[in-house]
Amino acid sequence: MTSKKSYKSYFFDPLWSNNQILIAILGICSALAVTTTVQTAITMGIAVSIVTGCSSFFVSLLRKFTPDSVRMITQLIIISLFVIVIDQFLKAFFFDISKTLSVFVGLIITNCIVMGRSESLARHVTPIPAFLDGFASGLGYGWVLLVIGVIRELFGFGTLMGFRIIPQFVYASETHPDGYQNLSLMVLAPSAFFLLGIMIWLVNIRDSKKRKR
């Protein structure tokens, strides 16, 4: 039986010390595509958390009844089910966000984090630890997206969650040609790549210092 301490480690390890995007370098494609605004970053983070947590739970629940010959396809079917539910929920209640995210919600099924947690952990442990690990892996992915989204939206549009943060009067105009201008690079996908690279670099520095101690 898994102890409470183990439950705690299943939840907190994927948030930082075993972060799937910063440590394992998984799920970076969507990180580049959906982080132009904070709203889309948060939505994708929540969606991946729910899909990974729920799919890991059911993969674990069915692990003793799933033959190895159909293991992968069974996992894909379970993941697809929750991706469809999330996609339809967003279309029904948050259509504007769903339209902005476009195909990327459906492409959660191809996110390596989701399949990775099902294959490497969920099929080896009981359902509760599997759910905690999967959900926390999604949250770990989500906070990285949030950091990138905050930087990109703030410097690319001057807003956060659609609200004006950088005052309009500081921007360049006909009477104030030397004023501030949004960084157009932040709207483009390469900016997310650079920001993610910096975050991974900082994590590697932290880990190397820990190893030297």
From Swiss-Prot:
Membrane topology: Multi-pass membrane protein
This protein's GO CC annotations: plasma membrane
Keyword line: Cell inner membrane, Cell membrane, Ion transport, Membrane, NAD, Sodium, Sodium transport, Translocase, Transmembrane, Transmembrane helix, Transport, Ubiquinone
Subcellular location(s) of the protein: Cell inner membrane
Single GO MF descriptor: oxidoreductase activity, acting on NAD(P)H, quinone or similar compound as acceptor
Catalysed reactions listed for this entry: a ubiquinone + n Na(+)(in) + NADH + H(+) = a ubiquinol + n Na(+)(out) + NAD(+)
Function: NQR complex catalyzes the reduction of ubiquinone-1 to ubiquinol by two successive reactions, coupled with the transport of Na(+) ions from the cytoplasm to the periplasm. NqrA to NqrE are probably involved in the second step, the conversion of ubisemiquinone to ubiquinol.
Subunit structure comment from the entry: Composed of six subunits; NqrA, NqrB, NqrC, NqrD, NqrE and NqrF.
Transmembrane regions: 21-41, 42-62, 77-97, 101-121, 131-151, 153-173, 183-203
A Pfam family hit: Rnf-Nqr
Protein name in UniProt: Na(+)-translocating NADH-quinone reductase subunit D
Listed InterPro entries: NqrD, NqrDE/RnfAE
Similarity field: Belongs to the NqrDE/RnfAE family.
Record-level GO BP terms: sodium ion transport
Source species: Chlamydia pneumoniae
EC numbers: 7.2.1.1
SS bond partners: none
